[in-house]
Swiss-Prot record:
It is found in: Cytoplasm. It is an enzyme of class 5 (isomerase). Mn(2+) 2 binds at residues 285, 290, 338. Belongs to the phosphopentomutase family. Isomerase that catalyzes the conversion of deoxy-ribose 1-phosphate (dRib-1-P) and ribose 1-phosphate (Rib-1-P) to deoxy-ribose 5-phosphate (dRib-5-P) and ribose 5-phosphate (Rib-5-P), respectively. GO terms for molecular function: magnesium ion binding; manganese ion binding; phosphopentomutase activity. It comes from Brevibacillus brevis (strain 47 / JCM 6285 / NBRC 100599). Pathway: Carbohydrate degradation; 2-deoxy-D-ribose 1-phosphate degradation; D-glyceraldehyde 3-phosphate and acetaldehyde from 2-deoxy-alpha-D-ribose 1-phosphate: step 1/2. Binds 2 manganese ions. This is Phosphopentomutase. Mn(2+) 1 binds at residues 12, 326-327. Its cofactor is Mn(2+). It catalyses: 2-deoxy-alpha-D-ribose 1-phosphate = 2-deoxy-D-ribose 5-phosphate; alpha-D-ribose 1-phosphate = D-ribose 5-phosphate. The keyword Manganese applies.
């Protein structure tokens, strides 16, 4: 075992340039980090720059460095999707060869009718929408009628929004459990049901931190399952536990936002364990990518960058820190959907003198294979370990 603890940070949606197959996903020219760097005045990421972020691809104001503190490269997604679930499942060794069902015209009336009958409330919306736009459009009507807001996106999701003072949280969660049950049927299949509670008044609604995801279980064991089976820790922070439907999770820690996510992974660095601590920093995607807000996205990246020294300081000699992403979400791209991009790969431990180029990894699963290799557990079916290059 080269490292007794691996800390994995997924910067949700922080892509680093279009993949060769991007045109098939209508994403030619997408470059999340590159376009943010170009658009945001005063943008700089000095700590990620020292780790080698600017050595991976050209980024304005994030120049390459002669001796990066981390090994660096980028990873390509091979699965047939560009959503959170697909990206995370591939990281942990699964190849999603069939795209998940999406509902560009809303959900079938048969599903909605049964859903309404089961929950005892009517449905508003039932269409593709941005989470903030649909609250502006239907939030007031929801408050007057008590009907829940149902919407989807370009991803395979069934989202239910409700005001916490109109529909109590426990009822909303029960409503989503009903939706999860119904959407496990092949004819209505979705990957995730998401509870989207909000507060506020018309014209000033805001989503709360009480979001809850109900994901389908991975179709095969992931590297996290292998760690758990071997008696090792597999700590899931933020929405990680939801993404894997609690499979292969030995401890689950909820988070409120990106900075809380950093606080929580720092907290696990103070724990004594052998295994993986895995966090998803969702704000980049949820608050800024989908809303096409490059300034907000850039600010969030700079806030995360400012926390890097704390993370490096908290690591022990035999710890490995990996920073990556799960897909892109270019905030200057057309539409409001994720984008098909390479993701950055930074791997740091205290023994590195000068980071080496890890190349373009052929699949996100190379990361899962590396973690499996380190802990001596069964390797995933796809992915090549780069442990010997660290």
């Amino acid at each position: 075992m080269q490292y007794s603890r691996v800390f994995l940070i997924v910067m949700d949606s922080v892509g680093i340039g279009e993949q060769p197959d991007a045109p098939k996903f209508n994403d030619a020219g997408a470059n999340t980090l590159g376009h943010i760097a170009e658009r945001v005045a005063g943008f700089s990421l000095p700590n990620l720059q020292k780790l080698g972020l600017g050595n991976i691809a050209p980024l304005k104001n994030v120049e390459p460095v002669a001796a990066p503190m981390a090994h660096y490269g980028k990873m390509q997604e091979i699965s047939m999707g560009k959503d959170t679930t697909t990206g995370h499942w591939e990281i942990m060794g699964l190849h999603v060869s069939t795209p998940f069902n999406t509902y560009p015209d809303g959900f079938p009336q048969e599903l909605i009718s049964e859903f309404e009958q089961r929950i005892g409330r009517k449905v508003l919306g039932n269409k593709v929408a941005s989470g903030t736009d649909i609250l502006d459009e239907l939030g007031e009507e929801h408050m007057k009628t008590g009907a829940v807001i149902v919407y989807t996106s370009a991803d395979s999701v069934f989202q239910v929004a409700a005001h916490e003072e109109i529909v109590p949280l426990e009822e909303l969660y029960h409503i989503c459990e009903v939706a999860r049950e119904l959407t496990l049927r092949d004819e209505f299949a979705v990957t995730r049901v998401i509870a989207r509670p909000f507060l506020g008044q018309p014209g000033n609604f805001s989503r709360t931190a009480n979001r809850h995801d109900y994901s389908v279980k991975p179709f095969a064991p992931t590297v996290m399952n292998r760690l758990q089976d071997a008696g090792l820790s597999s700590i899931a922070i933020g929405k990680i536990s939801d993404i894997y439907a609690e499979e292969g999770v030995t401890q689950s820690i909820r988070t409120k936002d990106n900075m809380d996510g950093v606080d929580q992974i720092l907290g696990t660095m103070k724990q004594s364990f052998t295994g993986l601590s895995f966090v998803n920093l969702v704000d980049f995607d949820a608050k800024f990518g989908h809303r096409r807000d490059p300034e907000g996205y850039g600010q969030a990246l700079m806030e995360f960058d400012a926390r890097i020294p704390e993370l490096l300081e908290a690591l022990q000699e035999n710890d490995l820190l990996v920073i990556t992403a799960d897909h892109g979400n270019d905030p200057v791209h057309h539409g409001s959907d994720h984008t098909r991009e390479y993701v950055p790969l930074l791997a740091y431990h205290k023994g590195i003198q000068a980071g080496q180029h890890l190349g373009i990894r052929e699949t996100f699963a190379d990361l899962g294979a590396t973690i499996a290799d380190n802990f001596g557990v069964t390797a995933p079916v796809i992915g090549k370990s780069f442990l010997n290059r660290l």
